[in-house]
Each structure stands twice: as C-alpha cells, then as structure tokens.
C-alpha cells in the first residue's frame, strides 16, 4: 500500500499525555515541522499528546501527517491535524502497519506504549526482520533506561548499538537526514 507517492515515512513514538504548551508537546510539534521541512511524511498513532503534536507540526509546516488509529479505540477521536487516518483493528495491527510502512523511527519520551513500540522495532532490528530502517532515541533518559535493561535482561552488548541517540529533536532530524534520504 502506497501511503503518499514520493515520500518516505518516519514513524514517531511518544506519550499520549503531553498537552499543548508543555515542553514535550512543543518538542514533538517542532519535530513534526522539521521532518516535514526535510521532506518526510510523519506517521504516528494519530491520537493525543506527542501523536497530536508531531502531526500538528508536520501539518502546519505543509507536510503530510498520517495517523494509524485503532478500531478498539473507536470512541476516541483522532487528532485534527491528520492528513490521513488509517484505521487498524488493534495494537498488533497498528504496530505491523507502522513497522512495515515506516522507513525510519524516532522515539520520544512516553509510557508503556512507547516502550512497547521501541522494543518491538529493536527486536525486529536485532533479529534482522527490519533492515536499513534507522531508529533514533531522543532524550537523555534513554541511555540510563537501556543500561538498566542491560543489567536485568539477557541482551548482547552489540544490540545496544542498533540505535542512534540524539539529545534534541534538531539533532535527531540532522542525524536522520545525514543517513537517510526523504525520497524513496
């Protein structure tokens, strides 16, 4: 399924709680604008918080924002900044769609959903089911979180090298554009 011809999609993972005016929301909004300005289409879960903010930023910058929503949340309204909504049945189908159609992944601060999304992509990278799709973890909390995971789970040291890290959204987009063209 072609989402929008001529665009590569970046899936952005992040929490559903940040509201407009809060730092995390504003950073996600900036990320969406930077990705759109660089020529990328933005994909997210399509609802509130970081998902809304990244869609808002992309849409206000003239870009494309795709929300991959879920039938199990039919009572929730998708955010108003989406160029297109793609409805999936549940979390599993949403993640399948995002991992199949995104050509890169950026993870911001979030909760269990963000950790699940990041972990799935990480596992797919580790097992070789995702190739040439970079994942950038944004924020200074990721390294200590991953060090804690390394101390408690059985994970090979080289698997921690599958990520790219960025302290800011500006750095994340600069890193992405240096290794990954927005054009297919």
List where the protein language model places each region.
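Acidic/glycine-enriched connector segments
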Residues: 26, 49-109
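Short active-site oxyanion
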Residues: 39-42, 133-134, 161-163
């Amino acid at each position: 399924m072609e989402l929008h011809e001529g665009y590569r999609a970046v899936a952005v993972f992040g929490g559903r709680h940040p509201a407009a005016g809060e730092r995390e929301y504003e950073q996600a909004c900036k990320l969406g604008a930077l990705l759109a300005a660089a020529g990328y289409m933005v994909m997210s879960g399509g609802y509130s918080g970081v998902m809304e903010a990244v869609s808002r930023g992309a849409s206000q910058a003239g870009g494309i924002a795709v929300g991959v929503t879920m039938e199990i949340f039919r009572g929730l309204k998708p955010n108003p900044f989406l160029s297109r909504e793609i409805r999936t049945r549940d979390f599993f189908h949403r993640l399948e769609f995002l991992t199949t159609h995104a050509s890169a992944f950026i993870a911001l601060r979030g909760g269990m959903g963000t950790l699940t999304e990041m972990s799935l992509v990480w596992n797919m990278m580790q097992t070789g089911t995702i190739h040439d799709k970079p994942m950038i973890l944004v924020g200074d909390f990721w390294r200590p979180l991953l060090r804690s995971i390394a101390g408690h789970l059985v994970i090979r040291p080289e698997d921690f090298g599958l990520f790219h890290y960025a302290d800011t959204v500006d750095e994340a987009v600069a890193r992405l554009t240096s290794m990954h063209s927005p054009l297919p």
